[in-house]
Amino acid sequence: MRTEVVVFTLHESGKSFIEIARELNLQAKEVAVLWAREKVVYRKRHINKKVKNGTV
């Protein structure tokens, strides 16, 4: 997986840039730049239930 994607997903899971930097052997500043450059928005999948006759 690309480093930018790894940084993005780890940050979204609640880790700080310092923790991510320690995991990936990078500096926190480099991690922040990678996170800011990642343009792709990853959306969580939602389950949509179809409504029939007003009931679920």
From Swiss-Prot:
Q: Which domain of life is it from?
A: Viruses
Which InterPro entries does the entry mention?
A: Phage_T4_Gp24.3
Its recorded name reads Uncharacterized 6.6 kDa protein in Gp24-hoc intergenic region
Primary gene name: y10C
